[in-house]
Amino acid sequence: MDAGCGTGVLGIFCTLKGAKSVWAYDIDRWSVDNTKENMLLNGVKNMEVVEGNASILQGKDAFDLILANINRNILLADLPSFVSVMHAGSQMILSGFYVEDIPLLVQKAKSLGLSYLNHTEKENWATLLFERL
């Protein structure tokens, strides 16, 4: 799943690297349309993109991998929705926030039952990797 897909680059990359299917969403109509255009340009047929926020995850089947490149405040608000569509062994990669946000995001994720695996930092930007046990 590509949450807040923007141009769709993360989801498209996953399909090109062998993902059987990708489901993506964004709150912005332009982003959804742009993702669809980029899917066409890249010959991607096994990806679905819809307009909406994390509330549209309610009732969805679990995903093996969740990717979310979104700012800290939205990530904090959406983490419970993300966890609700993770099964044991699902992984989640979060990005789009600053290094100083790491402790707050790790604390929130752990409080929701996720295991912190790793993080990377580059020029004050950070990425976090979690797994649901």
Language-model features and meaning:
Residues L65-L76:
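A short SAM/SAH-binding and catalytic strip from SAM-dependent methyltransferases
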Residues M1-S55:
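Conserved SAM/SAH cofactor-binding pocket of Class I
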Residues L76-Q91:
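A short glycine-rich, Lys/Arg-flanked "PGG" loop and its adjoining helix->strand segment in the class I
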Residues S115-L133:
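Core SAM-dependent methyltransferase catalytic element
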Residues G89-I102:
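ADP-ribose/adenylate-binding Rossmann-like module
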Residues D26-W30, I70, F97:
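Short beta->alpha hinge that forms the Motif I/post-I loop of the SAM-binding pocket
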Residues S55-L65:
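A short acidic, Gly/Pro-enriched loop at the edge of an enzyme's catalytic core
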Residues E100-L112:
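Conserved class I S-adenosyl-L-methionine
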